[in-house]
Every structure is written in structure tokens, then in C-alpha cells.
């Protein structure tokens, strides 16, 4: 059944003024018009990768706050909450923190849940139930074609169909610079893997090797070259492969004089050196900047190792500020190298170049998330042997290599197409769009 009550309806003139003063594209402007006029207590905005959802949400915040509403941002992870706040200006926190703190809301509250496709059913239900009791509005934002949620599963997909909401979608890719790549990602997102793969193949973006050693050597070499033209990230389907790639990257940087392993130190079972790029893997509010100001470390932060001393591990933030992590944080294994990340860890990250390495990550949602992280170029690396082995393990109906002529590129394509891992719930249908 649909949501029967109305909430968050604004004067169309107020919305028009806010849109006119913004730099929104037509699809973004339409989304704001629908969200502020439809009146559904629960609304859904599908924001595919690279379409500028946080920019659009910034205008949504502006128009609602001008009308006297309080806008709250929520996301499954601290990093996603931080990026939502930075991109939209909406004060944001994690869903878990919001539920624990039981923040007071009322009928003049709008709750924006970003990355809703990664949130569990129980968490989303709790947010909606609380909002419904007081008359607040909830806006679920996400993409049902990206990686599935890690909780109970299916909340966002179910909302697309069962909540009776006005579904709006951002459709213009504002991230990738090449038109062919924008088209290929859209094809991949909608399941047309054959056409998408052909485009990457045609533009020389697919690298197949005979064995894993050749694969990793080629990928690391290409990664080193691409680093000179922008921020470059390797992505893997498993933590084991990401770990191996990180070790190879560190050795290459040491060989080229870019990392001084003579001054490396061991802490928490891992070794680090000044200049190492690392990811912080747990929220930890009780840390401090070098000037003594308190600082909250958030899961997923990418930082650079500066030094280690008796006070802790000194790291450099992207802002240029330094944070001193207490030694116990690193000793618990909450710091890891970040030249290569798993695809799940990279969801929400944007960089210049992406190298997707190994067929373990080549299920459809995973490869879409990985390739859509890059602004300038994205590459696919796999060995023909790995692809064949994976095909044999899964009941795909593909003849074994002993039964037919082997085409490694076709095997890779079939692997991508047949190994979609999205855990759709029984409500997992396509959204009903409102134009």
C-alpha cells in the first residue's frame, strides 16, 4: 500500500527561485521539484554513479531550510555521511549513531538517507517508523544497480515498489569525461554487459594475461604510470588480492625511491613507512590534531603516514592537517595499506584512474561500482585461466574448455554477465518513474 499522508509540500514559487539560483541540470531540477511537491512521507531518489546527487541534495536542503524545516542527513558509513555533509551542506551522521541517540524530530523535519541501498531493512524501517509517528519526511537516496546492502537486505529495492513513492532519477553522468564510457556504464548498469564490455575492449581498456604473475606485474606497472597523471586506485574483489597488490605496490615504490623502507616500522601486525598511503578502518572519535584539537577518525578515511613516535602514529589528511592516532588504534589492526582497496571499501570513492584487477570482482554490480569510480579512465585486468576456473565453479551452462574452443574474452564477458550478486528481495522490481 502507498503512503497515505502528505509531508513536506512547499510553495512551488519558493522551489522555482531556489532552482533558478542554482547550477542544477534539468534532471536534478526535476528531482527537486517532485520531492518538494509530491507530499509523500517517504520519497525515493535514484542517483546513479556520477550524476551529482549531493549537489542536488544541497539545493533540496536550501529550499527546505528556507521554509523552516530541519534537514538531517544519514548514511550507513561514516565516510558516506561525511561526503554527504561535505557535498550538500546537510549535517549528517551514521544511521547507527542516529538510532542509538534517538534524536528528536517533528513534522518540520526532513531526513535524507544517502546510500540507502547499503542500509539494512531493520535500520531503514526504524527510521521510517519514527518519522511516520511524528509526521516527518524521509528521502531515500541510492542506486539499486550498485552493490547490495550488508544488513538484512532489500530495503531500498522494496521501497521503490511497495512504499508507493514518487521515484525520481538523476540520469545525466557528470563524472566520466568520455561519452563512450558514460554510455558503456549505463549499459552495464542496466544489464547489457555484452555491449558495455565490447566498448571497453574496443577502446583498449581490457587487459588479459596468461597467469596471475603476469597480471599483477602488468597491473602494478600500469598503476605506476597512471599515477603521474592523477589519483589512481587499484580495486580488487577480495581482501587477499588487495593485500597482495598493496605489497607489490609498496615494493615498486621502494625500488623507485618513492618509499623508504629503511625507516619502516611494524605495528598491529603490519609494516608501514613514512609516505605510505593507508585507509583507516574504524570510527574513533577520541583522536587529536597536531595542535591538540579533538578529531573524530571515520571509517574509510584515506590518509598518508608521516611518522610514528611514543605519542602514536602521525598521519596527513587530505586537507593538509595532521592527526595523531594513538598506538592502540593501529595495534588493533584498524589501519591498512590503500594503494589497492576492495570494491566494497571503494563504494563512494571518486578518483582519476581505476584498475579493476582479478575476476573475483567481476560480478555485474561490482564491476559497475568499480568502473564508475574513475573520472578519466577505468581498466579491467584478468587472466584467462582464472576466468575459466570461475566459470567451471558456477552453474552457468557454459561448456568446459575441453568441450569447445576457448575464447578468453568471451569467458570474461560471460563471467561478468552471469555472476550478478545482487540479493534482490521479493519486492525487488524496477522503480516507477515520475517525470
Describe the residue ranges of each PLM region:
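Conserved helicase motor core of P-loop NTPases
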Residues: 1-18, 30-34, 43, 51, ...
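Short, solvent-exposed amphipathic alpha-helical segments in soluble enzyme
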Residues: 89, 128-130, 248-252, 294, ...
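Structural motif
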Residues: 44-46, 74, 110-114, 139, ...
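Short hydrophobic/aromatic-enriched beta-strand-loop microsegments
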Residues: 91-99, 135, 139, 253-261, ...
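C-terminal accessory regions
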Residues: 190, 291-292, 298-435
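Conserved helicase NTPase catalytic core signature
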Residues: 2-87, 246, 309, 314, ...
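Short, charged/polar "capping" segments at the starts of alpha-helices
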Residues: 81-82, 148, 241-243, 386-391
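ASCE P-loop NTPase helicase motor core
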Residues: 41-201
Amino acid at each position: 500500500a502507498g503512503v497515505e499522508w502528505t509531508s513536506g509540500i512547499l510553495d512551488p514559487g519558493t522551489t522555482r527561485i531556489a532552482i533558478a539560483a542554482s547550477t542544477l541540470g534539468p534532471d536534478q531540477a526535476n528531482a527537486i521539484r517532485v520531492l518538494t511537491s509530491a507530499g509523500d512521507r517517504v520519497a525515493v531518489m535514484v542517483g546513479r554513479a556520477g550524476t551529482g546527487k549531493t549537489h542536488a541534495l544541497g539545493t533540496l536542503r536550501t529550499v527546505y531550510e528556507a521554509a523552516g524545516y530541519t534537514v538531517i542527513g544519514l548514511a550507513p558509513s561514516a565516510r558516506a555521511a561525511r561526503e554527504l555533509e561535505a557535498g550538500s551542506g546537510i549535517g549528517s551522521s551514521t544511521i547507527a549513531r542516529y538510532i542509538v541517540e534517538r534524536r528528536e524530530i517533528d513534522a518540520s523535519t526532513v531526513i535524507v538517507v544517502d546510500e540507502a541501498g547499503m542500509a539494512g531493512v531493520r535500520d531503514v524501517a526504524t527510521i521510517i517508523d519514527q518519522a511516520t509517528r511524528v509526521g516527518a519526511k524521509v528521502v531515500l537516496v541510492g542506486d539499486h544497480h550498485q552493490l547490495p546492502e550488508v544488513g538484512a537486505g532489500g530495503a531500498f529495492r522494496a521501497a521503490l515498489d511497495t512504499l508507493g513513492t514518487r521515484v525520481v532519477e538523476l540520469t545525466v553522468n557528470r563524472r566520466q569525461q568520455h561519452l563512450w564510457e558514460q554510455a558503456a556504464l549505463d549499459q552495464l548498469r542496466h544489464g547489457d554487459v555484452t555491449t558495455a564490455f565490447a566498448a571497453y575492449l574496443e577502446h583498449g581498456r581490457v587487459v588479459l594475461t596468461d597467469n596471475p604473475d603476469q597480471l599483477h606485474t602488468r597491473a602494478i606497472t600500469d598503476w605506476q604510470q597512471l599515477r603521474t597523471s592523477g589519483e589512481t586506485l587499484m580495486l580488487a574483489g577480495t581482501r587477499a588480492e588487495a593485500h597482495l597488490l598493496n605489497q607489490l605496490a609498496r615494493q615498486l615504490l621502494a625500488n623507485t625511491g618513492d618509499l623508504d623502507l629503511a625507516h619502516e616500522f611494524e605495528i598491529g601486525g603490519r609494516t608501514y613507512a613514512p609516505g605510505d598511503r593507508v585507509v583507516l578502518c574504524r570510527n574513533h572519535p577520541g583522536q587529536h590534531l597536531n595542535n591538540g584539537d579533538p578529531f573524530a577518525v571515520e571509517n574509510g578515511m584515506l590518509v598518508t603516514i608521516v611518522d610514528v613516535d611514543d605519542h602514536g602514529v602521525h598521519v596527513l589528511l587530505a586537507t593538509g592537517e595532521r592527526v595523531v592516532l594513538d598506538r592502540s588504534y593501529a595495534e588493533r589492526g584498524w589501519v591498512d595499506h590503500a594503494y589497492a582497496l576492495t570494491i566494497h571499501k571503494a563504494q563512494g570513492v571518486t578518483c582519476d584512474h581505476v584498475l579493476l584487477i582479478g575476476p573475483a570482482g567481476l560480478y555485474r554490480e561490482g564491476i559497475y561500482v568499480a568502473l564508475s569510480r574513475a573520472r578519466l579512465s577505468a581498466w579491467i585486468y584478468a587472466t584467462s585461466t582464472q576466468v575459466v576456473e570461475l566459470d567451471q565453479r558456477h552453474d552457468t551452462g557454459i561448456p568446459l574448455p575441453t568441450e569447445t574452443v576457448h575464447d578468453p574474452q568471451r569467458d570474461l564477458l560471460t563471467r561478468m554477465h552471469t555472476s550478478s550478486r545482487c540479493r534482490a528481495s521479493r519486492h525487488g522490481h524496477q522503480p516507477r518513474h515520475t517525470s
